[in-house]
Every structure is written in C-alpha cells, then in structure tokens.
C-alpha cells in the first residue's frame, strides 16, 4: 500500500516541503529562524484576528476599545500583550535571519534573497500601520511625522501624502485606512513567505561551510523538526515571559495617553525595531536626502549579491570579513540607540558617523575585504 503523504496531491506538497525535504547535514541553529518567523507570523495573524473582533477604527473610540479589550474581554489583555510583544519577537528573529543570510552568503540565492527583502519591506509597512492603530499619543505623532516625509518627493509628494492620509492631515479616515492595510498586508506577507519558501526549495538550503552540500543530505524530518522545536520552545518562553511579566517594557510610555493633535511630544520616535532606519533618516539635514537615505538603508540589501567579491561563499573562513560583519552589527546597535535619543549633541554627530559607516561597510569595505582575502589565499609560488 502506498503512503498517503507521498501520493495525495496536497499531502505530497507538504511532504516535499517539511518531511522528506533533503537538507544539508551540517546546518546550525542559525537555520532555525525561518521556521521561527513562520510561527511568529501565525501567532500575529491569530492574535490580530481576535483583536480585530473588538477593535474599532474610529478616532474617538480606538483608544478606549484597546482599553476595553484589556479590561473587559476574556483574556483580552493576554491576546493584546502577545500581539504587541509578538511583533518585537518577529523583528528580532527577522534581523537575525537577515544577519545570518549575510554572514553565510545565502544572498547568492538571488531570487530567494530579493523576495526576502521585499518581504522585509512589507513587514515593516505592516508593523508601522499596526503601531498607529491604538491611537496613543506617540503612535499618532509617529504616523504624522513619518507619513509627512512623503511630501519631500518632488512634484507628487504632497498629493501622495494626502492620499495616504485620505485628507489633509492624519484623521479618522487615515485610521480606518491603516486598519484595512494592517489587516490585508498580513496576508500579503503570508503569500510572499510562501513564494520565499518556493524559491528556497528550488535551489536547496545553504550551509555554514558555503560549499555544495548535495553529496551529504539528510531528511528534514525527524532531524530538523526536532531541532526547530527547541528553537520554538525558546521563542515561546521568551514571548510568554515578556507578555506576562513585562508587557510594556518595549513600548513607549506616551502611548498610554490618547492621541492629542494639539500637544506634541518632546521627542517623536517609532518602535524600537525601526530606530536604526529612523536614526539614518535624522542624520541627513535635508528632508528629501533623509527620505532617500531611509529607503537606501533597506534597499541596499538588494545589491549585496552583486557586491560579493570573495571566492568563498561563507564568512566562516574569512576573518577580515567576519570582523567587518561584527563591526556592522555593532554599528546597527549604535544606530538603534541613537534613534531613541533626542536630537542634540553628541547624539547628532554619533548618528551621522554611524550612518556613514553603515553604507561604507556594506558598499565599500566588505567588497574590498573579499578581494583582499582572495589575494591572501592565492599561492605565492
């Protein structure tokens, strides 16, 4: 009798993707983050679904509807805390996933990488519109400042900003539009994630050594399903610790006040996972230049595959590139810290140096390091 999972049209797809999938035998825990992101996405969609049942996208009642969810809905506080902190866990896994891709040279699977960058941009848009929905003070002003940046685009900027606002300022129509976008973008993210997975399974997975693993592969189940389960346990533990013991530690205190268009907070900032890009935006004194730098900070990932100069794929055996990679990591942490600080010295100059270093490392120093490592590995006789 033939096995159902190998003959049934639907089960066959699942089988080839998660059970009998040939995987390199030496992939490390860094390869867990793909599955962790999938689980994070499912958690976000499920908790968001239950929140949407009780949320009202109206200027007058949005803030109180979130308070109602936390106070009156059965386990509403838990659902809301899981959704808010789940976003932080999602982006933490996302940044580690991108970092691992750069370190091990996974960007050389160009189609998978490019879809991944589009996915990252879509997720950032989803998180941004979602952040505005509780209609807290910082959420409102964050939405006003960030969407107002569109007006810097020549000719069409003002029209574009008013189209995003559905009026002449952030208002009731903006909130309704953002709620709709937040809802629909979640499913677009899910569709893009499936495309990302399809492209990955066309080429097969990379491995830490960066060499072709075709001669040494093992089935995904049970080896990597067990390995991924360990990562999932850590994810659930961290998320539950955050949601149950310190649910507001990653949020902004200003969001405990309802949005007030007549009172500007002394320091406007987005959520922590956007602070690195926000710091780059603020480091350019010119408005249009700042917007372009903000876009470039993410879109620069698209050209990384074309800047690969090393003969070896992975950084595992390339100490100079490794050093530059960890400098880049420290640089991003610095930018995240600077994004949360007020616009005054010495934070302005630190932000400008860190922003310049970010682009210099990716566009110049890392490709040069690859060429130098090639030269060092050449036989000298």
Swiss-Prot record:
Keyword hit for Signal: no
Residues at which heme b b566 binds: 97, 196
Top-rank taxon: Eukaryota
Protein's name in the database: Cytochrome b
Localisation: Mitochondrion inner membrane
Database matches in Gene3D superfamilies: Cytochrome Bc1 Complex, Chain C
Miscellaneous remark of the record: Heme 1 (or BL or b562) is low-potential and absorbs at about 562 nm, and heme 2 (or BH or b566) is high-potential and absorbs at about 566 nm.
UniProt membrane topology term: Multi-pass membrane protein
Binding positions (a ubiquinone): 201
Keywords: Electron transport, Heme, Iron, Membrane, Metal-binding, Mitochondrion, Mitochondrion inner membrane, Respiratory chain, Transmembrane, Transmembrane helix, Transport, Ubiquinone
Cofactor(s) essential for the protein: heme b
One GO location term (cellular component): respiratory chain complex III
GO molecular function term, any single one: metal ion binding
Cofactor note: Binds 2 heme b groups non-covalently.
Similarity field: Belongs to the cytochrome b family.
Subunit structure: The cytochrome bc1 complex contains 11 subunits: 3 respiratory subunits (MT-CYB, CYC1 and UQCRFS1), 2 core proteins (UQCRC1 and UQCRC2) and 6 low-molecular weight proteins (UQCRH/QCR6, UQCRB/QCR7, UQCRQ/QCR8, UQCR10/QCR9, UQCR11/QCR10 and a cleavage product of UQCRFS1). This cytochrome bc1 complex then forms a dimer.
Binding positions for heme b b562 per the UniProt entry: 83, 182
Gene Ontology biological-process annotations: mitochondrial electron transport, ubiquinol to cytochrome c
Membrane-spanning segments: 33-53, 77-98, 113-133, 178-198, 226-246, 288-308, 320-340, 347-367
Function description: Component of the ubiquinol-cytochrome c reductase complex (complex III or cytochrome b-c1 complex) that is part of the mitochondrial respiratory chain. The b-c1 complex mediates electron transfer from ubiquinol to cytochrome c. Contributes to the generation of a proton gradient across the mitochondrial membrane that is then used for ATP synthesis.
